[in-house]
A protein has these predicted regions:
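Transmembrane alpha-helix boundary and packing residues in multipass membrane permease domains
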Residues: 40, 205-208, 253-257, 287
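Alpha-helical membrane-protein architecture signal
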Residues: 3, 7-11, 183, 187, ...
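Membrane-spanning alpha-helical segments of multipass transporters and channels
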Residues: 59, 251-255, 263-390
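Long, hydrophobic alpha-helical segments
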Residues: 190-209
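Extracytoplasmic/periplasmic domains immediately adjacent to an N-terminal transmembrane anchor
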Residues: 1-186, 380, 387-390
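Selective transmembrane-helix segments that form parts of the transport pathway or gating/packing helices
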Residues: 228-255, 360, 364, 368
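Juxtamembrane interface at the cytosolic side of transmembrane helices
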Residues: 203-238, 383
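Hydrophobic alpha-helical transmembrane segments
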Residues: 129-146, 179-194, 212-224, 245-253, ...
């Protein structure tokens, strides 16, 4: 009995995969490394022991007490003591430290006399995440320090602790960070960052698997095995990669949410189905791009750029809604953008299908453009006019 073209192409692709080490590296090693990398990069999930410096121009018991209070803040680690601000500022510019606290000369004397004085802090804000942490920690520290003289005088006058607190803090606040109460970076970034990496790998692997047929002059054999049916040729060729990357996605979700215990408000089925949909949509995008630019050397550069743009426009580190309007609308041309929106819905509330059906539909729509361009892809493979473009 004659073997079906689909099975024949599938077996042919499996033979190609096991005969070339690049497929093992890109389909197995890179995703596994990405899982390990994203599971460990954030450590305990918070920024701690950031190097800062101190400029102590007062050299008194009060200034030394302030330095001890600064050292007690988990965010900081005082690595340098400076004689003047110029040297400290130079180290901030060199990123040897991320900020410094300046205690002016005569600070203790002014505090004891009840005169106004100031503690100044400087921090490197070009690195926004680090700068925000340094700024917040300094703000909290100096708020505590600023009330110490008042408390000392009030206690000396015989005022009890409750009256002092009601005077200094007439209004108290309660802070309740939703979905991430520990302010853990890994809770928000680990899973989407992995899939940002994965979509870049997917784009490159998919275009390489198709483009290498032309590069190594095997496209005629590929089509012949598929009995001239380009739909069978493409789907059977990509099926092993779909299976491998979906398995890697499921493994990643298990590691992140099962082993690392990152909190989520949905079940594994919803996460895994969304991940599988991202894999298929990204492969469809890669086929579409290759059909438009069927030259191997050109398409690798194009999909690398598209993968990088997808990482930027995924909305993981900066809200896309606040980007330039044309960029915001362009972000929906990338599957990873829809995946991130679905993931945020599932992980941080599981608000229901009504809030994410649009993104699911968009991921499914990515399957249509490559189908329309399959005839063009077949003609380019038969003509072989793009095979030798460098």
């Amino acid at each position: 009995m004659k073997e079906s073209p689909f099975i024949a192409v599938l077996k042919r692709e499996l033979d190609r995969m096991v005969s070339r080490r690049i497929y093992f590296a890109s389909c197995i090693v890179l995703p596994l490394f990405s899982i390990f990398f994203m599971a460990t990069i954030f450590g305990n999930g918070q920024m701690e022991n950031l190097p800062v410096g101190v400029v102590d121009g007062d050299n008194t018991a009060t200034s030394r007490e302030i330095i001890r209070m600064t050292e007690a803040v988990p965010t900081f680690r005082i690595t340098r003591h400076y004689a003047d601000e110029a040297e400290a500022r130079a180290d901030v510019q060199r990123k040897s430290i991320y900020g410094y606290l300046s205690i002016p000369s005569g600070f203790e004397a002014k505090v004891m006399d009840g005169k106004e004085t100031a503690l100044t802090y400087y921090y490197h804000y070009a690195l926004m995440s680090v700068g925000s942490e340094i700024h917040g920690a300094f703000q909290s520290l100096l708020k505590s320090i600023s009330v110490v003289p008042i408390v000392t005088h009030a206690v000396a006058l015989g005022i009890n602790q409750e009256e002092i607190e009601s005077f200094l803090l007439p209004v108290t606040t309660q802070n309740h960070p939703l979905f991430n109460p520990d302010m853990d970076y890994s809770v928000y970034l680990t899973q989407p960052f992995f899939f940002v990496f994965l979509q870049v790998i997917l784009l490159l692997v998919t275009t390489y698997s198709i483009g290498s047929e032309g590069k190594f002059h095997t496209s005629a054999n590929w089509l012949a095995v598929a009995d001239g049916n380009i739909w069978v040729a493409v789907t059977a060729k990509l099926l092993p990669y779909s299976f491998i990357f979906i398995v890697m996605s499921i493994l990643a979700n298990y590691v992140f949410f099962g082993v690392m215990h990152i909190p989520m408000d949905c079940g594994f089925w919803a996460l895994n189905l969304t991940s599988a949909l991202l894999v298929i949509a990204t492969q469809a995008l890669a086929v579409f791009l290759f059909s438009l630019f069927p030259a191997f050397s050109i398409i690798i550069s194009i999909v690398s750029m598209v993968g990088s743009l997808g990482a930027t426009l995924g909305g993981v580190t900066f809200p896309v809604l606040h980007m330039f309007a044309p960029v915001y609308y362009a972000s929906y041309l990338f599957p990873v953008r829809h995946f991130v929106e679905i993931g945020q819905n599932l992980l941080y509330g599981n608000y229901g299908y009504a809030y994410m059906w649009g993104n699911v539909a968009c991921l499914l729509l990515f399957l249509i453009p490559p189908l329309l361009l399959l005839p063009h892809l077949k003609r380019s493979l038969i003509s072989r006019k793009y095979d030798d473009i460098e």
